[in-house]
């Protein structure tokens, strides 16, 4: 990269480039032909059988470990990025040899050995080694047309990481990396990528003027062992100003589909498809002004989530959010639109409180258990008097007369209007 100089364009022919780490200079462009793959793993081809297990010797890699205490329930070795794959499927790590079973591996770091629970002969076995594919603090970098896979990216770090201003990351497939797939900073753009099956999370971004558009973000957050409610799922955006998240398809992620968390202001979510994400659809948390409009939601959150958790659209200790013209199908479970207030302190632009939020002109399909409204377990009076409003929405419910509309307490649809004055211009359709 240095030999090319600032502003140079690099072309990668089709082929697999293993364990490469690229640090672009200012204004450089990296383009890939169809079939150009940056692969952060080492092929494992030699195994010996020891006591019914298969062993690869000489494995000296040991990636940086972050947040090993943020474990998903039952996970072993969360935050250990030294993943092992068989036929493009990540195996599950265990922390002792006596727990080794089919579908798992044990990395004995003291002996530089990887033990497998299954016979690897005739299979493609790979071990993640390199911590990133493309990363630097340079400005104005473009990355396009690559497949980027199987990097030992630490928790919260990305295989493609644009730490400078104005990166454009487009038309890549980014998959099977331990931590995050893609990260960008201010005035960066993530466009038309397929970001899937990364261990912790698909996307991450922070800064001003960011555009996230046209991406498919799928099946992330399942195998790093990190608790996705701490951080994981489809994508998470922090300390942004003017963030635009538009026309993305975020689906089947473990965690939220899309998540703005901590001091985001002037955010727009527009025209996104958000489907079948385990924790909920869009969560706007401890942040400020946002517009969430013209999105569609199907099957997010699921059953078993209490209160208004797991809403298709969740506004959590945030203010000045307008939610309108969204379509929400929660007929398979989960909640609709939830405004939630807890004790979260204050941030860059004032208190983290759930006030001045407007929910209008949305269409929702709910079960009799699916909730809508505003709830608090801290300073409820401030939330109730804080200018939050619901109006001109259309609700399709399987049964009438249920207490599924919340404004502090829970009410029937009729009392939601008559008692607390919410959704007076809205309609409820039963059946």
Predicted regions and their residues:
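Extracellular parallel beta-helix/beta-solenoid repeat domains
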Residues: 1-431
């Amino acid at each position: 990269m240095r030999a090319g100089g600032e502003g140079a364009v690099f072309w990668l022919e089709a082929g697999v480039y293993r364990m490469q780490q690229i640090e672009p200079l200012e204004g450089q462009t990296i383009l890939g032909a169809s079939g150009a793959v940056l692969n952060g793993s080492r092929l494992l081809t030699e195994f010996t059988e020891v006591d019914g297990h298969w062993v690869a010797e000489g494995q000296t890699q040991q990636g940086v470990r972050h947040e090993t205490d943020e474990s998903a329930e039952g996970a072993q070795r969360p935050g250990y990025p030294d993943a092992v794959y068989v036929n493009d499927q990540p195996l599950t790590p265990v922390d002792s040899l006596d727990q080794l079973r089919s579908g798992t591996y044990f990395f004995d770091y003291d002996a530089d050995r990887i033990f497998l629970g299954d016979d690897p002969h005739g299979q493609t076995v790979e071990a993640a080694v390199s911590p990133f594919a493309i990363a630097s603090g340079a400005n104005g970098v473009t990355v396009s047309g690559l497949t980027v896979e199987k990097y030992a990216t630490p928790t919260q770090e990305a295989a493609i990481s644009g730490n400078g201003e104005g990166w454009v990351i487009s038309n890549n497939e980014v998959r099977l990396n331990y931590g995050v797939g893609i990260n960008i900073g201010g005035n960066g753009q993530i466009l038309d990528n397929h970001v899937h099956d990364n261990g912790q999370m698909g996307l991450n971004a922070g800064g001003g003027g960011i555009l996230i558009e046209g991406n498919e973000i799928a099946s992330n957050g399942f195998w790093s062992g990190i608790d996705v409610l701490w951080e994981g799922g489809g994508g998470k955006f922090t300390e942004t100003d003017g963030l635009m998240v538009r026309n993305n398809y975020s689906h089947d992620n473990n965690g939220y589909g899309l998540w703005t968390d901590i001091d985001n202001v002037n955010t727009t979510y527009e025209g996104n498809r958000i489907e079948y994400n385990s924790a909920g659809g869009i969560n706007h948390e401890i942040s400020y002004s946002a517009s969430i409009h013209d999105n569609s939601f199907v099957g997010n959150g699921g059953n078993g989530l209490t209160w208004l958790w797991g809403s298709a659209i969740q506004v959590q200790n945030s203010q000045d959010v307008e939610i309108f013209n969204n379509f929400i199908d929660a007929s398979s479970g989960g909640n609709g639109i939830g405004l939630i207030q807890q004790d979260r302190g204050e941030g860059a632009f004032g208190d983290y409180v759930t006030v001045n939020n407007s929910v209008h002109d949305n269409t929702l399909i709910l079960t009799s258990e699916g909730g809508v409204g505003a709830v608090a377990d801290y300073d409820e009076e401030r939330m109730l008097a804080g200018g939050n409003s619901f109006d001109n929405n259309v609700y399709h419910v399987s049964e009438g007369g249920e207490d599924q509309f919340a404004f502090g307490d829970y009410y029937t649809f009729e009392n939601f209007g008559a008692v607390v004055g919410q959704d007076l211009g809205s309609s409820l359709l039963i059946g």
